Amino acid sequence: MKDMSNKKIFKKYSRVAGLLTAALIVGNLVTANADSNKQNTANTETTTTNEQPKPESSELTTEKAGQKMDDMLNSNDMIKLAPKEMPLESAEKEEKKSEDNKKSEEDHTEEINDKIYSLNYNELEVLAKNGETIENFVPKEGVKKADKFIVIERKKKNINTTPVDISIIDSVTDRTYPAALQLANKGFTENKPDAVVTKRNPQKIHIDLPGMGDKATVEVNDPTYANVSTAIDNLVNQWHDNYSGGNTLPARTQYTESMVYSKSQIEAALNVNSKILDGTLGIDFKSISKGEKKVMIAAYKQIFYTVSANLPNNPADVFDKSVTLKELQRKGVSNEAPPLFVSNVAYGRTVFVKLETSSKSNDVEAAFSAALKGTDVKTNGKYSDILENSSFTAVVLGGDAAEHNKVVTKDFDVIRNVIKDNATFSRKNPAYPISYTSVFLKNNKIAGVNNRSEYVETTSTEYTSGKINLSHQGAYVAQYEILWDEINYDDKGKEVITKRRWDNNWYSKTSPFSTVIPLGANSRNIRIMARECTGLAWEWWRKVIDERDVKLSKEINVNISGSTLSPYGSITYK
């Protein structure tokens, strides 16, 4: 600041000095003119004594002096100093340019290394994603529909996952490419990472396509999204032209499946944004929570190749030396949001499959899982019935998706073909970025999103009404006791039990006798007892049947026969 002030003062007085110099020139001209007039007067007096000379007026003298000064100023001999060409201003520009060059040449590597190494954070906490918190829910609910009674049971569950490969959606590809810089903050956990854009050092990337050898590694001078994408395209084209041998490359398939209970649960289970699944597959979360539908989602990740970025030895290795600590701090780097480095990106395609049914069977998950694994379910009657009453949807992201963008069918064999088709890498079936992995720039530790969520697991069991068919063919007097409970639930999910009994309990019945006792679909804890009169004083009544846990069925056939001393009884189901 002091130097600049001195320069301004010097500039000011230089201009004053210039004005004084001009004034001095004018003075000299006036003096010289006056001396010349005196000399001319003396000569005139010598030659002519009688004639008085006419003195020259001061106005004329000044006018002549001014004219001479103008002539001098306009002559080529005069040095002209235009304001824009002042030597001092030019010097200031040169000095500023020099200072800028010094700043760009200044090395901030040590400063950035020290700061990033000193960042204090917990890897699990900065990338913690807390999903839903469940407080109130109805644990059980009973719904009566015609001859059906549906019990919807809800249980509170916890899920905690730490996936390291994060699904890529189209909206974030420009900040999830190999060697991209990100912030470990909430945006990252929600698959909407914040990018750190700054001047970078050259970066080496490697593609794992077979046969390329050292040609598989290239250096990108300025690792922006556009430049890295171009480099990857060049590597892929080079492989197709020189190393593929005209052959296709089979995909490496990763497979995960999960029943769907809530948005946060399926996000954590499959490591994918529920908005993608909801938008592409159309998941009816409301019907699932009501127990009206059961849904399973399977994700097939088919990887054609992976591109990796060389990990830095030190944090500052990724930055140009001119990048300052203040710049990184302005762009969000802090203890709460430490920097991340995208270490690798997988390219290929992802197939999402939705299996949906309104079946209330407890075997739905097993049936769906068997179908996905290619098991022949036709030999299993229960599984076959479930799949026949199910619908299937497949959505392909990446690859030649134009052929199988979205398929909805009742035939699971069609879904199997979608999964198998275009599962090889070729020019006609290109790869797209499907997932990526990031590391903390501080220590190259893998950054995994710590998903913590509560959800309600909803299961529904459907019961059908039944009946008891009593048949007495024995040569004795018989008595029955038929008891059961009817189950309902109040608005808080608490079980309400109503005791029921047959009106003819303990009434004596002679052979032949038969009757039908209807049972509601919510009947449980069925007890059936039948006894016969022996006529023996020491054992007047003898039990023929005594079953305390008879299961509800469409038809429960209770038969008694035989003699007083050799009675026979049986219970069969239909």
Curated annotation (Swiss-Prot):
Biased composition, class Basic and acidic residues, residue ranges: 53-64
Disordered: annotated segments: 37-64, 84-111
Translocase is among the record's keywords: no
Localization annotation: Secreted; Host cell membrane
Membrane topology: Multi-pass membrane protein
Job of this protein: A cholesterol-dependent toxin that causes cytolysis by forming pores in cholesterol containing host membranes. After binding to target membranes, the protein undergoes a major conformation change, leading to its insertion in the host membrane and formation of an oligomeric pore complex. Cholesterol is required for binding to host membranes, membrane insertion and pore formation; cholesterol binding is mediated by a Thr-Leu pair in the C-terminus. Can be reversibly inactivated by oxidation.
Protein name: Streptolysin O
Source organism of the structure: Streptococcus dysgalactiae subsp. equisimilis
Lineage of producing organism: Bacteria, Bacillati, Bacillota, Bacilli, Lactobacillales
